A protein has these predicted regions:
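C-terminal regions of proteins
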Residues: 96-98, 333, 338-391
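Hydrophobic membrane-insertion alpha-helices, especially the h-region
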Residues: 5-25
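Short, flexible/disordered intra-domain loops and linkers
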Residues: 135-141, 325-334
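Substrate-recognition/cap regions that form aromatic- and gly/pro-loop-enriched pockets
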Residues: 288, 306, 314-318, 325
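Catalytic nucleophile-elbow at a beta strand-turn-alpha helix junction centered on a G-D-S/GDSL motif
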Residues: 57-78
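Secreted/periplasmic serine-hydrolase-like ester/acetyl group-modifying domain
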Residues: 151-297
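Alpha-helical transmembrane signal-anchor/signal-peptide segments
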Residues: 25-47
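Membrane-embedded segments
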Residues: 72-162
Length: 391
């Protein structure tokens, strides 16, 4: 009688335990290819932080992962996601970035998927504004930090020990990480050689493992039911244009959409964020600099991770809008220090860089004072297409 009563309950518990403990890769077939395709243009927090979507995407050769930040939200007709839909080149861009997803966020992206990156072509878009003197702060890191990726990082035994220690110490600088007790204990066991930290981390390990798997299952359900594509903005006329014609078309579009100001800044952005405070903005960046920042160390971790994983990245160096930065008091020679430093760092790592720093005064290269748009996207599209087609 008791066996009959408790049998179904025990079976349910056993099935739940199996579902909880089996490796995540065995759950990938539950996520449809259609869902991954829909997620390619999504910029939702849940998508950017999702491991299962990244794993499924990286397993499909049709996707070209693009890592960056808030420029991806400037989704006009020239944006890679829209341009290559109108004029296919054999790949689909998969966007991994939104405001605040700087190098350290992408360190976790790469550390948690490095076993899938070998020989994988990827695009990495750098923003000068990442390289402020304090580097990424809590305000930008916290909304983009993925606990799930953090737990996967601590169980990644393929990382070189010194690199793993460096990343763990860096993560422990942030309150959002330290508030996650299990993760904090586990990271301290990696970051510090003191025995007390090692013992605590060892005791926490089985609980961290189970919690990681719970987060993986939550991620699966979110990816299945809560990720929607970004609204498309397609221009069919681009299909018949060569690169020069597309750039001219982008210039014309930019001129129409930024007629309210002399800087070539999109009307909506200028009128809502700048116009009323234009006088106060004169000289407001005179004390800023991008040539000394912890961000360079975070970028070096990105480079080292990509080297260890065997990935094939193209880095893209985006300029600032020259006339606006002149007005704001950030001198050109100081901007040049950043461009030169980041270019040399990437070249030293042995990776190609599409450097567009000479386009500061190309009026419609950027949509505002720092985000790509219009003509800038056309240049990026061409660089991506050439990179993808090259052996």
């Amino acid at each position: 009688m008791n066996k009959a009563k408790f049998g179904p309950m025990l079976l349910a518990l056993a099935l739940f335990a199996v579902f909880l403990l089996i490796p995540t890769r065995f759950l990938l077939p539950l996520l449809s290819d259609e869902k991954v395709e829909q997620a390619a243009t999504s910029l939702k927090e849940e998508k950017i932080q999702s491991m299962i979507l990244q794993q499924k995407m990286l397993a499909d050769p049709k996707y070209l992962p693009m890592y960056g930040s808030s420029e991806f939200a400037r989704m006009d007709a020239f944006h890679p996601s829209n341009y290559f839909k109108v004029k296919p080149e054999g790949f689909t861009p998969f966007l991994l970035g939104r405001g605040g997803t700087q190098d350290l966020v992408h360190v976790l992206n790469f550390a948690s998927t490095m076993d899938q990156l070998k020989d994988k072509k990827i695009v990495f878009v750098l923003s000068p504004q990442w390289f402020v003197p304090q580097g990424i702060d809590e305000t930008h890191f916290a909304p983009n930090f993925s606990k799930q990726q953090g737990y996967h990082f601590i169980f990644n035994n393929d990382l070189k020990p010194e690199m793993k220690k460096q990343i763990a110490k860096r993560l422990l600088n942030f309150e959002i990480v330290k508030k996650e007790t299990l993760l904090k204990i586990s990271l301290e066991g990696i970051a510090y050689d003191d025995t007390k930290y090692k013992v605590k981390a060892l005791a926490a390990k089985p609980f961290a493992y189970i919690y990681r798997n719970i987060l993986d299952r939550k991620d699966l359900f979110t990816a299945m039911f809560n990720i929607k594509p970004h609204k498309e903005k397609l221009d069919p006329s681009l299909k018949q244009m060569n690169w020069e014609e597309a750039r001219k078309h982008a210039d014309q579009t930019g001129a129409v959409e930024s007629g309210s100001n002399e800087y070539g800044i999109e009307d909506d952005y200028f009128n809502s964020k700048i116009k009323k405070k234009l006088k106060q903005r004169e000289g407001y960046l005179k004390n800023d600099a991008y040539d000394q920042s912890p961000e360079y160390e975070d970028l070096q971790i990105v480079l080292d991770l990509l080297k260890q994983s065997g990935a094939k990245p193209l880095f893209i160096s985006v300029p600032v809008k020259g006339p606006w930065y002149d007005y704001a008091g950030f001198p050109k020679e100081r901007r040049e220090l950043y461009y030169k430093k980041v270019h040399e760092q990437i070249e030293k790592a042995g990776y190609p860089i599409a450097d567009f720093s000479n386009h500061e005064y190309d009026k419609y290269f950027l949509k505002d004072h720092m985000h790509l748009g219009w003509k800038g996207w056309v240049y990026i599209d061409e660089a991506i297409q050439q990179f993808y087609k090259a052996n």
